[in-house]
């Protein structure tokens, strides 16, 4: 099955990010709706932003989070390297065309431990990135 994966890392400037996503949507529309497309990445725009709304209101792409039959998302995706940070803000997204169904969606919150200096048997939790990874189990219809 032919498929297209588009990765994005949007700017922090809200006007530019909305415009860049409109350009991406135009390119996807040029494919004529015939090819399955997955658009994923760090959009630096949460689920309430103009950028996000531009994408989901286009009816070209849907949010895997919203489509998932089973969802594991105890926090948002941006953690600022703080393992104790909790948020509902998702700035990392997986969008897909109607060629796909989403079985499961998850925000993976695994941390690792490092020894605390000058303290025996003491460890500190760390995040490997300032964003938690997002994963989806999808099926081509």
Per-region residue spans from a language model:
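Metal-dependent phosphoester-hydrolase catalytic domains
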Residues: 15-38, 43-141
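Glycine-rich phosphate-binding "P-loop"
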Residues: 8-14
